[in-house]
Amino acid sequence: DDIPQAGINYCTSENMQMDLRKQKKAVGGYYASVAYLDAQVGRVMNALEKSGKRDETIVIFTSDHGFHLGEHDFWAKVSLRDESAKVPLIISVPGKKPAVCHSFVELLDLYSTLSSLCELPKQDRLQGKDISPMLDDPSYEVREEAFCVAPMRTGFLLRNKKWAFIQYGEKLPAKLKGGFEHGRNGIELFDMEQDPQQFTNLADTLKYQPVVQSFRKKLQDKLVTIRNCDLKNK
């Protein structure tokens, strides 16, 4: 009851007519797909080894979105919960030692990172960040938080180690309520330390209103920043 309508994935068990048998089949099918993908990645890596080009090739494994397998009674993608918004990211660079990094990054960062690794000229106008320092220092912090968008529901996510803030809707027309209202379709706030599976929305809890207002202002500033780009005059 504490989740706004805009935050409910349209691919629910009810909408998808997913009884228990179908749910088990879907999960099994997903695991099978992952196993198949793993085998194909292995084929690519073996081919690189045989070609003699492994030591001069940068390999990046990632995806454009995650996937729900029944969490929150959601299926497929589209939501801004962790299961859907987080993606795998594995980078293999010749001469770099294996490591695990925990900094927040965005897919937007990959272009800047590859440009740096390939020693291409730096472009200051890019919004993505070079994450290659993590390859030498796994503790390196690229971003304090990540930003994600679900355009179909005008949803915005700001995610840091402590909080996941999700806002649906950006503003009302000026003729309504005398001006702008951010988050007109609802807001979600999750304590990722105490509630990592995102079960309890704290957005309407009086105690956390300073946190909500801080994120609303932060998101407003973020949207202004990212829209100040080469496309604005196109």
Where are these regions (language model features)?
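Active-site-proximal cap/lid insertion segments
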Residues: D1-F104, L117-R125, A174, F180-R184, ...
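Non-transmembrane alpha-helical segments in soluble domains
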Residues: Y31-V34, D38-M45, E49, Y111-S115, ...
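C-terminal cap/loop subdomain of S1 sulfatases and analogous C-terminal strand-loop tails that border
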Residues: H65-E71, S92, K97, E106-Y111, ...
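Short amphipathic beta-strand/extended segments with alternating polar/hydrophobic composition
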Residues: H102, Q167, N201-A203
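Intrinsically disordered, low-complexity polar regions and short flexible loop motifs
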Residues: D195
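Short amphipathic alpha-helical coupling segments at ligand-binding clamshell hinges
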Residues: V211-F215
